Amino acid sequence: MADITLISGSTLGGAEYVAEHLAEKLEEAGFTTETLHGPLLEDLPASGIWLVISSTHGAGDIPDNLSPFYEALQEQKPDLSAVRFGAIGIGSREYDTFCGAIDKLEAELKNSGAKQTGETLKINILDHDIPEDPAEEWLGSWVNLLK
């Protein structure tokens, strides 16, 4: 089993690029990783460390590729008390639902007993053309919280 499972939800690929970049950085730091783009709930370990990275689609909506995962969290209410997670949202402050998808995912993970490590990073694409940069900066402090 990987030390850290990265879960990405993306419409245009931005969150996937961030997940791949962070997986590379985590491996350079000595962690093993598994990156899953739009996984189903049953594809994930019910314990360990998850890093959830999601863009926001439409009016604060979960990206299509992560909707089945989100809906399973809501409907099945799995026991995720053995999961610690970090969260990164990507969105635009032009919308009043800025990073609404990561807010929804974070809430459902907590409702299922998962414990959040660190604060959620919310990346405004209007300020960061390359969302990998602020995500990498955040990752350094997040990894320290895992120790």
Swiss-Prot record:
Disulfide bonds: none annotated. Its cofactor is FMN. Residues 4-143 form the Flavodoxin-like domain. InterPro entries: Flavodoxin/NO_synth, Flavoprotein-like_sf. Belongs to the flavodoxin family. MioC subfamily. One of its GO terms (biological process) is regulation of cell division. It comes from the Bacteria. It comes from Escherichia coli (strain K12). This is Protein MioC. Keywords: Electron transport, Flavoprotein, FMN, Transport. GO terms for molecular function: FMN binding. GO terms for cellular component: cytosol.
